Amino acid sequence: MKVLVLFSVLFLTLFSYSSTEAMDEFDSDAEEDMLSLMANEQVRAKACTPRLHDCSHDRHSCCRGELFKDVCYCFYPEGEDKTEVCSCQQPKSHKYIEKVVDKARTVVG
């Protein structure tokens, strides 16, 4: 019986040691993978299109305002030319919300 208890304790010790080694190896691999993904994302990031500039090449490339991202609006100008013109603009509702938030910040401190 003593041998069985001793063998069980030895087995549990070795098992816990091997599982912690495997977890440490897994954690280091996960950290390396996360760092490589972040580096790839930074390389892949592109420059945003400023407000009131042409966004017809990429309609999702508008820059962020203070609180909200600008939206690419497309329209057809008056006249004989029927080409579509797109520009990054701030929606009026976002403009009003930003004004209210600015006023609240000045009042609160």
Swiss-Prot record:
Domains (record comment): The toxin is composed of 2 domains: a highly rigid N-terminal inhibitor cystine knot (knottin) domain and a rather flexible C-terminal linear cationic cytotoxin domain that forms amphiphilic alpha-helices. The presence of a 'disulfide through disulfide knot' structurally defines this protein as a knottin.
Cellular compartments annotated: Secreted
Protein family per UniProt: Belongs to the neurotoxin 19 (CSTX) family. 05 (U4-Lctx) subfamily.
Position of the signal peptide: 1-22
Keywords, alphabetical: Calcium channel impairing toxin, Disulfide bond, Ion channel impairing toxin, Knottin, Secreted, Signal, Toxin
Record region (Knottin domain): 45-88
Predominant location category: secreted
Region Linear cationic cytotoxin domain: start-end pairs: 89-108
Native species: Lycosa singoriensis
Official protein name in the record: U4-lycotoxin-Ls1d
Role description: Enhances the high-affinity desensitization of human P2RX3 purinoceptors.
Propeptide feature ranges: 23-44
UniProt tissue specificity: Expressed by the venom gland.
Cystine crosslinks: 48-63, 55-72, 62-88, 74-86
TM annotation in the entry: none
Database matches in InterPro entries: Spider_toxin_CSTX_knottin, Spider_toxin_CSTX_Knottin_CS
GO cellular component: extracellular region
Pfam family of the protein (one): Toxin_35
Claim: Signal is one of the keywords in the record: yes
Domain of life: Eukaryota
GO molecular function: calcium channel regulator activity; toxin activity
